[in-house]
Amino acid sequence: MPVRSLSSSVVVWPDRAAVESALRLWAEEAARIPELVRVGYFGSYARGDWGVGSDLDVVLIVAGADLPFARRPVAWDLTRLPVPVDSLVYTQDEWRGLDPASRFARVLAREVVWVWPPGERVVA
């Protein structure tokens, strides 16, 4: 979360590099769970226009899921990250089935920065 300087009233919010590094470390540990297929982020941190109070929008792709879409994020503890997190958890089939004509799918296609597996750039 934010860090207050001891000699100032200025609040310093974690920058993109710090947040991405923390997410990469989280993803490496979470990858021990075989259902996890991909981890990425989008939104203000991906676009570079984050600021004090910005959250991290995370997308997780999993092999399959028993929980309904709205309840899946509770299964993934992202509280160790240095900023608040809003997460979306899609199965591979749901991710592939996103309507490419929808505004949200276009935003995801344009913005998602994949951090796991290493070197991953796109999800087919």
Name each model-derived stretch.
Residues S54-L56:
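Short, conserved active-site loops that position catalytic residues or coordinate cofactors/metal ions
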Residues M1-R38, R47-V52, V62-A124:
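Catalytic core of pol beta-like nucleotidyltransferases
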Residues V58-L60:
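Short beta-strand->loop micro-motif that forms the acidic, two-metal-ion catalytic signature
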